[in-house]
């Protein structure tokens, strides 16, 4: 454990951010998986609605630096292609 006061504070804030980032990433992954599941079911309307939420989560994660912006774009493109193929 850190001894210096500022290092102790940084450790606390880093842990808080780590937990928050982890939750944000998990929510993003869940949204993407939900779209995939709906595509497999063949439910195009529900998949399109879930796609809107997944897009929002991906963009937010990219803007916060949790994922690279190109990964967000790639994932959105792949999801859109799967939905369009229905």
UniProtKB/Swiss-Prot annotation:
InterPro entries, per the entry: Ribosomal_bS20, Ribosomal_bS20_sf
Record key words, sorted: Ribonucleoprotein, Ribosomal protein, RNA-binding, rRNA-binding
Location of region: Disordered: 1-25
GO terms of biological process kind: translation
Ribosomal protein listed as a keyword: yes
Keyword Phosphoprotein: no
GO terms for MF: small ribosomal subunit rRNA binding; structural constituent of ribosome
Annotated GO CC locations: cytosol; small ribosomal subunit
PANTHER family attached to this UniProt entry: 30S RIBOSOMAL PROTEIN S20, SMALL RIBOSOMAL SUBUNIT PROTEIN BS20C
Membership in a protein family: Belongs to the bacterial ribosomal protein bS20 family.
Function: Binds directly to 16S ribosomal RNA.
Protein name stated in the entry: Small ribosomal subunit protein bS20
Species whose genome carries this gene: Exiguobacterium sp. (strain ATCC BAA-1283 / AT1b)
Gene transcribed to yield this protein: rpsT
């Amino acid at each position: 454990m850190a001894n210096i006061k500022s290092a102790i504070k940084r450790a606390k804030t880093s842990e808080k951010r780590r937990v928050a980032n982890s939750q944000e990433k998990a929510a993003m992954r869940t949204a993407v998986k939900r779209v995939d599941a709906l595509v497999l079911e063949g439910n195009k309307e529900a998949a399109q609605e879930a796609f809107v939420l997944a897009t929002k989560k991906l963009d937010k994660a990219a803007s916060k630096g949790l994922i690279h912006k190109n990964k967000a774009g790639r994932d959105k493109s792949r999801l859109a292609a799967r939905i369009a193929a229905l």
